[in-house]
Amino acid sequence: MTNDAVSRLAPLPAAEWSEEERAILRGNLARADRYLSGDPDGPPVPPIIGLLARHPRVGGAWLSFSGALIEHGSLAERERELLILRVGHRTRSRYLWSQHLAMGTEAGLDPHDLQALRDSTVTDRWHARDRHLLMVADELVDDHTVSDATWSGLRDYLDEQQVLEVLFLVGSYVCLAMVLNSVGLHPELKE
């Protein structure tokens, strides 16, 4: 995980958002909407939402794309979190890793799974379907493509749409990790 504690681009405090900016971000991802109500008694806005508020049109589009993958995808929640956490670890994104630990646990990943996600190699501790998912994540991070052998193994478990979903999910979270790492967004940042 990156060790830089300096934020190059701090989240925009919710008190500074216009109603138009809030409206652009709202309605794209149900998980995010609870933070976008503008209600003073609402939950604290996570730093990533404040970051997206700095460019609401791009932030809203990002939330919409994420919503399609997270809320309308066909992968099991556990598999989705497995992939996201692997990307978080492999890209050294402290924010991504820390934000998805609880989600991964809620989705069924146990402490041994979470520790194994930090291993540099994918071992037989994972059942075959998970092993192929992790291999896809590793190959996309390392090589920006999936090998024929991994593709073939993945197709034993997933249909075409699910394979595309895996590719888009990993790719989108690699992109997000690059943004988070570059701007210096870390879990301990507060609004």
Q: Which ranges hold each PLM region?
A:
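Secretory/endomembrane lumenal or extracellular ectodomains immediately following the signal peptide
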Residues: M1-E77
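Short alpha-helical scaffolding segments that buttress acidic/His motifs in well-ordered protein cores
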Residues: I49-L52, W62-L69, L82-G88, L117-R118, ...
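Conserved alpha-helical segments that form or flank metal/cofactor-binding pockets of metalloenzymes
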Residues: G60, E81, V87-A107, P111
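Alpha-helical scaffolds flanking conserved acidic
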Residues: L75-L83, Q161-E165
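C-terminal end-helix/capping segment
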Residues: M103-D113, L117, V179-E191
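A contiguous pocket-lining binding segment that forms or flanks enzyme active sites
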Residues: A107-V136
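Acidic/histidine-rich alpha-helical segments that form the ligand environment
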Residues: H127-Y157, Q161-L167
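Acidic, carboxylate-rich catalytic segments that either coordinate divalent cations
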Residues: G153-R155, Q162, G171-C175, V179-E191
